[in-house]
Structures are given as structure tokens and as C-alpha cells.
Amino acid sequence: MNDTLKQIGSTGIVPVVVLNKADDAEPLAQALVKGGLPCAEVTFRTDAAEESIRRIAKKFPEMFVGAGTVLTTEQADRAVGAGAKFIVSPGLNPKVVEHCLKKGYPITPGIMTPTELEVALGFGLDVVKFFPAENAGGLKMIKAMSAPYTMMKFMPTGGINATNVRDYLACNKILACGGSWMVKGDLINAGNFAEIEKLTREAAAIVKEIRG
């Protein structure tokens, strides 16, 4: 496992962020750092994503910022060019995975079936995103797939919350969980970064409680 994935694993929870305005990037990053989760997956669902990553990477070098919802090789290049330290995609697009590996970008593609998992193994990956986690069978499905694929670690995302994250984190097949409950869009849009910091601190406490 590469150092990037090890750092994600040490964080335990990766806040999955949707930013509509790049001006929200710095106060959000500050809230996450102060709350104890200096990590963020900024999704490429908005026009502000690239600039948001750039601002976070520049202002908060201690922040482990990556890009999520990366669907194309061009998005991957833009994200890394802006300062993203890792790439996450919702599905497994062989073209995107191959491009990222060739360029040396840490890539975690999404899977939800054993067939997709085997494709990931074929690329030499040892961590995959399990998405959409809860709708795709949750922890029960991950444990079932782990039986024949003992070498693979998972980063479940989708439907993870402050309640069920404990069960996921307690499983030794889980590298980290992606979640957005501490960075909800309405809180970001309202500029309520104090509440985001509070929720982030609570999330970080869960990681410490479960993993020590």
C-alpha cells in the first residue's frame, strides 16, 4: 500500500465535500483541520472544485486534499495540477485508472461487484472505493467479498453516517470511510463552519474511540 493510502487510513474518515463556491474552500478546510480531520475529498461535481482544491492546497499544506467524482483523464490531470494528492472515482473506468497509474496519481476507483474488484486487482490496486456502500449491501457485502479477496481493503462511501460508521471502522477490511454528514451542503452554503468544526471533532473522536 502506498504512503498516500496509508495516510488516508490513519485519518479513518474522509470528509466528502461539494463546494459551489471556491470562497468557501479555505474556511471549510480550517474547520476540518481544527476539528481533527485534516483531509477532504473535494468532488468534481461543480465548477468550483478545481479552484477549491488549489486554494486548500496552497493555504493548508498540512491538509490532505484529494479529488472525488473524477470521471475523465482530463479531470484527473486538472485535479492533480491544482494540488490534489489523491484521486477517487465513483466507478471503475479502466481508461482513467490506467492513466492515473501511468502518471503516478494515487487512484481509488469505485466498485460494487466481485467482477469489478478483479479488474482493480488486475491493475495492481489494493484499495477500492465501495460505492454506493449502504445501497450496495453495506458492511455485510464487503465482508462477503473479502472472503475470497483477502488482500483488498475498502473505502466505503454512500450512506455512511455518525451512527453506522462505527461498525465500518471496526472491520479490519476497511481502510477508511467516506462521509459527508459533517460537511453537509446546507451548512457550507450558510457559512456555518463552527458547526462543521463541531461535527468534525465528533467524527474524529469516533475514529479514536474505535481505532485508538
Predicted segments, located by residue:
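Shared catalytic-loop signature of beta/alpha-barrel
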Residues: N135, K140-M155
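Distinct, well-ordered alpha-helical segments
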Residues: A25, I53-A57, L121, I142, ...
